[in-house]
Amino acid sequence: MDTIIATHELTKIFSGRAVVNRVNLSVPQGAIFALLGGNGAGKSTTIKMLTGLLPADAGTATILGEDCWADAIDLRYRVGYVPERPRFYDWMTVRDIGWFTAGFHEAGFAPRYADLVQRFRLDPAARLKTLSKGGYAKVGLALALAPDPEVLILDEPTSGLDLFIRREFLASMVELAGAGRTILLSSHGIAEVERVASHVGFMAEGRLLLAASIEELRKRIVRVRLHFDGLPPDPADLGQVLQFETSGRLWQAVLQDPNRLALDDLRQQTGIRDLEEMPLCLEEIYTALLTRFHRPEGVQATSNGRVRKSEIRDQKSEVRSKNRPGSFFPDF
């Protein structure tokens, strides 16, 4: 599958701080790629470099094989862009802003814009200043789609919209991707984009924590839950540990890239009961990735706080000590 959007070690520095730090992205043709993260994660700055509004301080960014900064003018006719807070001449009507913008584009823009206005159920005679947030966002999307772009980039497109409009807006993205367009959108509303995204990338503090297709994510990050008798298993033997906790005889861990052979062996071990492996939703994955990103080396995080790796060894030693000849019976 062709790669439409690509970055390599993309970096942007403001005031001596890397707000985008060596980001590597690969977005295939026809994908709906959701760039997810909280405010200040670096999503908007990444998008500004992709749309030619900011030069990169290091690394590269390309769309359709063209450099996003050096070839920005050529890409303007092939890439539609809707910023987080679009601003138009609010004294114009919906029809006027289309007529005005058509002067900067090739023939065909005006009739496509008129069709989109009708499709989005906008009143052509309504002044922009009278539109709701949802209506204003639809005007921005119509202007971005009217040039018939191959790629669509949306920065927080559902910010400030009510629930019904957000769902309607995101559903329209599926139609556009089905028609062959490649879409990259940023959002901090992780749960709402899960229903439409085919690929996701998680960002925090300028870094890309993980990027993959939804299908791949379901396999790469899982929650393993079990009950144990005797010695608790060491989660570090089963893959990269993002989260881990025990409560009594209940043991559970969130693992990235689980070791399948080790998990199969664990199922056969005496004293291991009710082992379950479950996929996570995007919000749970992002929480687990942030937990791993923020904790110091040598420390494992749980939902109850931080636990050092040695705690598992100490727990095992305690069990062995309780089972030595002459000791008290284990209080299991």
Q: What name fits each language-model region?
A:
Residues 18-22, 26, 298-300, 306, ...:
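Detector for intrinsically disordered, low-structure N-terminal pre-sequences
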